[in-house]
Amino acid sequence: MTQDEMKFAVAQAALKHVVKDTIIGVGTGSTTNFFIDALAKIKNEIKGAIASSKATRQRLESYDIKVFDLNEVETISVYIDGADESDDGLNLIKGGGGALMREKIVAAVANQFICIADESKLVTIMGDFPLPVEVIPMASNYVKYQISQRIGGTPTVRENFITDNGNLILDIKDLKITNPKVMETKLNSITGVVANGLFANRGADILLLGTSNGVKIVTRLIG
């Protein structure tokens, strides 16, 4: 299977986790786009969706899928999104597309988080993919310094990119993330950080992993 064929396969598999007659959360990225395309075929079975980015909203609306504002709803049955990296514990790095803050909010509200990815995203130790951190623009230099001193790695400002919230993204290279929950909490404690791309304190519940042998289902171990 090619990478796109794996993404297509997990997108189709994710449809089985869509709860009928509810509002679902939809993430951002290339794999999620495959899911939106698949979702269009069963759009009449759901009430609508919450989009994690402007790009996702546009794609959903192009299929006439109703998009709700998060403040209009009380619950989201399931959140379906991709990942840039995942470890065996279903801790994730996300935010390659720059939508990490909104993705975190929607994931926090959802009853269940289903991650869809191809097999190249599953790693033993995360960090080869640069870790995105959304920062207030006026604090970018301060945050870069604090990351270098307190976290390590090499943070750089993502060029020519502004988030949907009007902020900057720092991408941290040269990390080996052995304790994702601790690093997520430490990054969030730096003044000026809006959010970081570690989804560990609220990781995925289920990973649908596209492989050359089909879709593998990986479940988060509790405890």
Swiss-Prot record:
Pathway the protein acts in: Carbohydrate degradation; pentose phosphate pathway; D-ribose 5-phosphate from D-ribulose 5-phosphate (non-oxidative stage): step 1/1
Annotated GO CC locations: cytosol
Any one GO MF annotation of this record: ribose-5-phosphate isomerase activity
First-level EC class: isomerase
Keywords linked to the UniProt accession: Isomerase
Active-site residues annotated for this sequence: 103 (proton acceptor)
Binding site for substrate: 28-31, 81-84, 94-97, 121
InterPro entries: NagB/RpiA_transferase-like, Ribose5P_isomerase_typA_subgr, Ribose5P_isomerase_type_A
Enzyme Commission number(s) of this protein: 5.3.1.6
Keyword Signal listed: no
GO-annotated biological processes: D-ribose metabolic process; pentose-phosphate shunt, non-oxidative branch
Catalytic activity: aldehydo-D-ribose 5-phosphate = D-ribulose 5-phosphate
Description of how the protein assembles with itself and partners: Homodimer.
Family indicated by similarity: Belongs to the ribose 5-phosphate isomerase family.
Protein purpose: Catalyzes the reversible conversion of ribose-5-phosphate to ribulose 5-phosphate.
Protein name (database record): Ribose-5-phosphate isomerase A
Lineage: Bacteria, Pseudomonadati, Pseudomonadota, Gammaproteobacteria, Candidatus Pseudothioglobaceae
